[in-house]
UniProtKB/Swiss-Prot annotation:
Pathway: Carbohydrate metabolism; tricarboxylic acid cycle; (S)-malate from fumarate: step 1/1. NCBIfam families: fumC_II, PRK12273.1. The lineage of its organism: Bacteria, Pseudomonadati, Pseudomonadota, Alphaproteobacteria, Hyphomicrobiales. This is Fumarate hydratase class II. Involved in the TCA cycle. Catalyzes the stereospecific interconversion of fumarate to L-malate.
């Protein structure tokens, strides 16, 4: 039989597995919310540890927290930050919308670990109380939103942005590699005028660069913290200067710039900065979806498709068709992007649900946001390393496309006019002939004139 200890809260005693640091409220949550498999993200757990450590420092400086107790809280919180106590955070996302159970999970774990460090008995709440000491000057209503913002900023800065920059670097390398390869452009999926393959890839690189810049643009708003607003934004039970001190301590702990939100009522009741930031992530997903689609279609074939690109062959593609290889990295990335579009819809709705002084969709917002960051970062790296860096041009196919294109007739607009050029192109298409044959045979140009005007290399920029 598993050994237990008795923990208590305002509802009375409850048994908790003896080797677990959580207490009564986390235990009740395990029983009350048996919903799904989605646990609190590790980045949120880490962020809760950061908040508790920063609050302990601020409380020792401003609220008279006993240094012995405060130092023990700081030490225990550091273990949470370092991921040493992650197994003691078992709660699911689907709980109270304020994240109260997860805040109390952190309070209880840090309390019991600090008690253990001080030689006390877990479950006694002495000498470190989860509410009176670990949660001192705080409410779940400002603590969980603060942890959300910390986690989101850290994951964007340390995971998503480096991944997108990695992809951007690889695309820029392809721009250089393909700069002299002239191909036919396509608009409305139909043949258009020429451009270089490098120019086409420069569009992809520019999209990723814009995505990076747009996400970075959202970080200042996301770096404003609710901590210090306590229950409804008034700062009740927090000392003067607590909000500013906590933001300062969080900045020191993370090495990132955080500030206290100028209006705590807004910080508790709305999460517009989360919606704004995820909107930029959603736009990045839209950009990567387009890029992945273009690349897989340009690589279609190998004999009956567009066949302009040769994509890396990473694994067998079919259980029934021998030798088949598929554009799996594009498929994985576009699935991720589609999922992010769904997350964005959920976040947008959740952001609108700040009823009066508190938004109560916090855990779901944090989970979806962080999932998007994780997935897009992972997928961008996978797509870069397993696809983009190995892309090669199939120059023979590209050349044939240029030679057969009817849209080269656009180069004759200035010489012959739109209507005659349209007639030449349509006649060539109908007869299965070339532009040269119809232009020269129809008496519009000589062979020499055709060669003078229809030069793809002169059609890839302003003249």
């Amino acid at each position: 039989m598993t050994a237990t200890r008795t923990e208590t809260d305002t509802f009375g005693p409850i048994e908790v597995q003896a080797d677990r640091y959580w207490g009564a409220q986390a235990q009740r949550s395990l029983g009350n919310f048996k919903i799904g498999w989605e646990k609190q993200p590790a980045s949120v757990v880490r962020a809760l540890g950061i908040v508790k450590q920063a609050a302990a420092r601020a409380n020792m400086a401003l609220a008279g927290l006993d240094p012995k107790v405060g130092d023990a809280i700081i030490a225990a919180a550091q273990e949470v930050i370092d991921g040493k106590l992650t197994e003691h955070f078992p709660l699911v996302v689907w709980q109270t919308g304020s994240g109260t159970q997860s805040n109390m999970n952190a309070n209880e774990v840090i309390s019991n670990r600090a008690i253990e460090m001080l030689g006390g008995e877990m479950g006694t709440k002495k000498p470190v109380h989860p509410n009176d000491h670990v949660n001192m000057s705080q409410s779940s209503n400002d603590t969980y939103p603060t942890a959300m913002h910390i986690a989101c900023v850290e994951e964007i800065v340390h995971h998503l942005l480096p991944a997108l920059k990695h992809l951007h670097t690889a695309l820029e390398a392809k721009v250089k590699q393909f700069e002299k390869i002239i191909k036919i452009g396509r608009t409305h999926t139909q043949d258009a005028t020429p451009l270089t393959l490098g120019q086409e890839f420069s569009g992809y690189a520019a999209q990723v660069a814009s995505a990076i810049a747009n996400i970075e643009l959202t970080l200042p708003a996301l770096s404003k913290l609710a901590q210090g607003g306590t229950a409804v934004g008034t700062g009740l039970n927090a000392p003067v200067g607590f909000a500013e001190k906590v933001a300062e301590e969080i900045s020191e702990i993370t090495g990132l710039s955080f500030v206290t939100a100028p209006n705590k009522f807004e910080a508790l009741a709305s999460h517009d900065s989360m919606v704004f930031s995820h909107g930029a992530i959603n736009a990045a997903a839209a950009a990567l979806f387009k890029i992945a689609n273009d690349i897989r279609f340009l690589g279609s074939g190998p004999r009956a498709g567009l066949g302009e690109l040769s994509l890396p062959e990473n694994e067998p593609g079919s259980s029934i068709m021998p030798g088949k290889v598929n554009p799996t990295q594009s498929e994985a990335l576009t699935q991720v992007c589609a999922h992010i579009f769904g997350n964005n819809a959920a976040l947008s709705f959740a952001g609108s649900q700040g009823h009066f002084e508190l938004n109560v969709y916090n855990p779901m917002m944090a989970y979806n946001f962080l999932q998007s960051v994780q997935l897009l970062g992972d997928a961008a790296v996978s797509f870069t390393d397993n696809c983009v860096v190995g892309i090669e041009a199939r120059e023979d196919n590209i050349r044939k496309g240029v030679e057969n294109s009817l849209m080269l007739v656009t180069a004759l607009n200035g010489k012959l006019g739109y209507d005659i050029c349209a007639k030449i192109a349509k006649t060539a298409h109908k007869n299965g002939t070339t532009l040269r044959e119809e232009a020269v045979g129809g008496g519009y140009l000589t062979n020499e004139e055709f060669d003078q005007y229809v030069r793809p290399e002169n059609m890839i920029g302003p003249k």
